[in-house]
């Protein structure tokens, strides 16, 4: 008897990717095969994104494609909280579940394609690190779920609930398994990484027989013992974030902080229900760079938020000139169903949003170009992501996968994905570096 086969489509952010990995790990444990072909699958699972309208549209399109190609489709993920919308567009879906409802997804798969009764999990073991959808040399490490903030443009708490921190011992044990499996970079993710442990009052857990506090700084210190790159994402700028800068300066954690500032105008930040301390933030950035000169700062911003005036937008551009951030993403404000910001007065016209977005990107591009040019002539460590006939492509400590730039490496010796090499930088542009391998 052949094993049932599952097709899987994973959309959205790295946190959703980790959810997909968890579901697939359970299905593989039960003997299911995972297939990349729609027509070879007994059932297709689509893990959706529902954060903004464009993501919902992409999710609905992916569901429709899976139905057209296969016909047996189970929907899960963030858009699953809007089951009526999904069924209105695609009434033939077999089941709809929300985010984090892993067991419900597996039960739905059982209902369509039951697992083999003669499957012995002890003879067909899943790798200890579980099924991973990333390349072997890096992995996302989710440390918590949900968020306690109530930003006016966001509906994540209504989809994923309040903050729930994973036990620190479980997180560190998972990290150990990943490193043993060959992972060389751990990307720490959550909805709010710097709030890790606040829901359980930073209670201590145990790892390798010793207590470790459920707190970002202590977690990072423990992860540093594993001897691989540790990169921090989605870090809300609480005061205790200052503590990890010392770990970065000492080489224990990558000197990289992903902090979603969203805007700089105090008036817009208040409307967003975000901290409106942009002047203090500039002072902190200055202190961080004094303590850790190699620090890379990444952030995301929203332009065209309801009520944003030309004065607010110019304030943001001036702030960007002061902050000199290294890596920046920018989005035009898009209404999200259920978000409080939808009720705010003075929406910004689409053509103004587009014009401001273009000006913002041009402004930041000049900053990025100048900052990257200072790295020419320096020697940096590069983790190789891919190799083809044109050469090797990798990332430095300043580059997260898929969202930042990359380093194009010229090497006389053959390279492969996962290699860590020393590179002398020879050229740069707005986002990327070029260099020669020296070791």
From Swiss-Prot:
UniProt keyword annotation of Iron present: yes
Reaction it catalyzes: L-aspartate(89)-[ribosomal protein uS12]-hydrogen + (sulfur carrier)-SH + AH2 + 2 S-adenosyl-L-methionine = 3-methylsulfanyl-L-aspartate(89)-[ribosomal protein uS12]-hydrogen + (sulfur carrier)-H + 5'-deoxyadenosine + L-methionine + A + S-adenosyl-L-homocysteine + 2 H(+)
Signal peptide: none
Domain TRAM: 373-439
This protein's record includes keyword Iron-sulfur: yes
Record-linked InterPro entries: Elp3/MiaA/NifB-like_rSAM (IPR006638), Methylthiotransferase (IPR005839), Methylthiotransferase_CS (IPR020612), Methylthiotransferase_N (IPR013848), Methylthiotransferase_N_sf (IPR038135), NA-bd_OB-fold (IPR012340), Ribosomal_uS12_MeSTrfase_RimO (IPR005840), rSAM (IPR007197)
Gene Ontology annotations for the cellular component aspect, listed alphabetically: cytosol
EC id: 2.8.4.4
Pfam (any one): UPF0004
MTTase N-terminal domain location: 4-114
Alphabetical keyword list: 4Fe-4S, Cytoplasm, Iron, Iron-sulfur, Metal-binding, S-adenosyl-L-methionine, Transferase
Main localization (coarse): cytoplasm
Cofactor annotation remark: Binds 2 [4Fe-4S] clusters. One cluster is coordinated with 3 cysteines and an exchangeable S-adenosyl-L-methionine.
GO molecular function, one term: 4 iron, 4 sulfur cluster binding
Gene3D superfamilies xref list: Methylthiotransferase, N-terminal domain, Nucleic acid-binding proteins, tm_1862 like domain
Positions annotated to bind [4Fe-4S] cluster 2: 147, 151, 154
Radical SAM core domain span: 133-370
Top EC category: transferase
Cofactor(s) named in the record: [4Fe-4S] cluster
Gene Ontology terms describing biological process: tRNA modification
Binding site for [4Fe-4S] cluster 1: 13, 49, 78
NCBIfam families attached to this UniProt entry: 30S ribosomal protein S12 methylthiotransferase RimO, MiaB/RimO family radical SAM methylthiotransferase
Function according to Swiss-Prot or TrEMBL: Catalyzes the methylthiolation of an aspartic acid residue of ribosomal protein uS12.
Family: Belongs to the methylthiotransferase family. RimO subfamily.
HAMAP family tied to this protein: MTTase_RimO
The protein's name: Ribosomal protein uS12 methylthiotransferase RimO
Organism: Bordetella pertussis (strain Tohama I / ATCC BAA-589 / NCTC 13251)
Gene that produces this protein: rimO
């Amino acid at each position: 008897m052949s094993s049932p086969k599952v097709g899987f489509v994973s959309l959205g952010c790295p946190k959703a990717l980790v959810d997909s990995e968890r579901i697939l790990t359970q299905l593989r444990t039960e003997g299911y095969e995972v297939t990349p072909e729609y027509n070879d699958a007994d059932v297709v699972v689509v893990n959706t994104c529902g954060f903004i309208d464009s993501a919902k549209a992409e999710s609905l399109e992916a569901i429709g494609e899976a139905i057209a190609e296969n016909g047996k489709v189970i929907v899960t993920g963030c858009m699953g909280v809007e089951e009526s919308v999904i069924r209105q567009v695609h009434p033939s879906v077999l089941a709809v579940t929300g985010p984090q409802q892993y067991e419900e997804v597996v039960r739905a798969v059982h209902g369509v394609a039951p697992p083999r009764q003669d499957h012995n999990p002890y003879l067909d073991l899943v790798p200890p690190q579980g099924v991973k959808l990333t390349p072997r040399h890096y992995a996302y490490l989710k440390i918590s779920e949900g968020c306690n903030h109530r930003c006016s443009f966001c509906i994540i708490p209504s989809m994923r609930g309040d903050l729930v921190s994973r036990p620190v011992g479980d997180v560190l044990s998972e990290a150990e398994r990943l490193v043993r499996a060959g992972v060389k970079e751990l990307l720490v993710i959550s909805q709010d990484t710097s709030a890790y442990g606040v829901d359980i009052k930073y209670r201590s857990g145990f790892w390798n027989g010793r207590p470790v506090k459920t707190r970002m700084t202590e977690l990072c210190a423990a992860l540093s013992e594993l001897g691989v790159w540790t990169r921090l994402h989605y870090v809300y700028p609480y005061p205790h974030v200052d503590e990890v800068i010392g770990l970065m300066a000492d080489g224990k954690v990558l000197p990289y902080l992903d902090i979603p500032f969203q805007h700089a105008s105090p008036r817009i930040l208040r409307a967003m229900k975000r901290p409106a301390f942009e002047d203090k933030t500039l002072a902190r950035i200055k202190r961080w760079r004094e303590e850790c000169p190699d620090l890379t700062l990444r952030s995301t911003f929203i332009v065209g938020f309801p009520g944003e005036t030309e004065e607010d937008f110019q304030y943001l551009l001036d702030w960007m000139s002061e902050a000199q951030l290294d890596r920046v993403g920018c989005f035009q404000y898009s209404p999200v169903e259920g978000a409080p910001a939808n009720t705010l007065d003075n929406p910004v016209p689409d053509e103004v949003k587009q014009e401001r977005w273009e000006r913002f990107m041009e402004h930041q591009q000049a900053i990025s170009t100048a900052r990257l040019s200072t790295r020419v002539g320096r020697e940096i460590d590069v983790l190789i992501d891919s190799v083809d006939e044109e050469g090797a492509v990798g990332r430095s400590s300043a580059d997260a996968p898929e969202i930042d730039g990359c380093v194009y490496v010229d090497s006389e010796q053959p390279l492969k994905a996962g290699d860590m090499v020393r590179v002398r930088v020879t050229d740069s542009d707005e986002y990327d570096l070029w260099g020669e391998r020296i070791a």
